């Protein structure tokens, strides 16, 4: 990819999120390019969208130009995946940091939550206090400000037998299909509209109510983990990322 095309893409990103939220200077990018514990590598830009629509527009621009997209939230570096790893990629890399999109919606009287892209375990812990509940992770990740979504995508947790690793079948996410086209997949269990822009705007604005929530048998956690992890004589791995019954969607 030519320098001119990279410069053109940077201009598009600035138009979407503003100059202050598109980082291109080496020194300023360093905190995003290196995980606190694991992973490091160069990106030509770090962009920090302020809402879900900005995030969608950034994804469209980056996918159209064929650059590598690395999604990043708190960047703890606990499991890797939130930074480049080395500098031998075949295409330029852009990091999309989601920490400005940090809202959490409590639904069904606090029985469930919808965490937006940059929501953290810190915030979730505070919101759940009045319901006498705790986040899915309270041992390690909470103490360093890890994100909710990063935990789900990177299979974190599993130390607490009653909760198991982070896992859900209920999510709203973007993916690039086999034809290279970006598409928005709504498996959240909430009727938010028909097109990506409408869906994302309604979600962020909380423009939905109990009638829009679809109650189904989909899981937001592994309800069999506490039994499986006790099967010490089993030859089947108990850990989530080796358990094929829980692989799908964002998990």
What are these regions (language model features)?
Residues 105-107, 117, 121-122, 126-251:
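FAD-binding subdomain of flavoenzyme oxidoreductases
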Residues 48, 72, 115, 146-148:
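Short conserved micro-motifs on helix faces and helix-strand junctions that flank
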Residues 71-75, 82, 98, 117, ...:
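Glycine-rich, histidine-containing beta strand-loop boundary motifs that form or position
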Residues 1-60, 77-114:
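N-terminal flexible segment immediately upstream of the FAD-binding catalytic core
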């Amino acid at each position: 990819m030519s320098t001119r095309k990279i410069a053109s893409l940077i201009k598009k990103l600035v138009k979407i999120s503003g100059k202050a939220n598109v980082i291109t200077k080496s020194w300023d990018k360093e905190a995003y390019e290196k995980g606190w514990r694991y992973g490091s590598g160069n990106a030509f830009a770090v962009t920090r969208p302020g809402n879900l629509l900005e995030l969608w527009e950034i994804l469209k621009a980056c996918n159209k130009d064929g650059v590598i997209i690395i999604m990043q939230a708190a960047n703890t570096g606990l499991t890797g995946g939130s930074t480049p790893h080395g500098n031998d990629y075949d295409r330029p890399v852009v990091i999309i940091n989601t920490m400005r999109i940090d809202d959490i919606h409590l639904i069904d009287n606090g029985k469930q939550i919808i965490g937006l892209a940059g929501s953290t375990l810190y915030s979730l812990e505070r919101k759940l206090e009045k319901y006498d509940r705790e986040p899915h992770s309270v041992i390690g990740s909470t103490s360093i400000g890890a994100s909710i979504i990063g935990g789900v995508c990177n299979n974190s947790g599993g130390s607490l037998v009653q909760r198991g690793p982070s896992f859900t079948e209920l999510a709203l996410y973007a993916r690039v299909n086999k034809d290279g086209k970006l598409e928005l997949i709504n498996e959240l269990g909430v009727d938010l509209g028909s097109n990506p822009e409408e869906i994302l705007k309604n979600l962020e604005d909380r423009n939905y109510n109990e009638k829009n929530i679809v109650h189904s048998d989909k899981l937001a956690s592994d309800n069999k983990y506490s039994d499986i992890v006790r099967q010490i004589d089993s030859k089947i791995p108990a850990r989530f990322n080796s358990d094929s019954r829980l692989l799908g969607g964002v998990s």
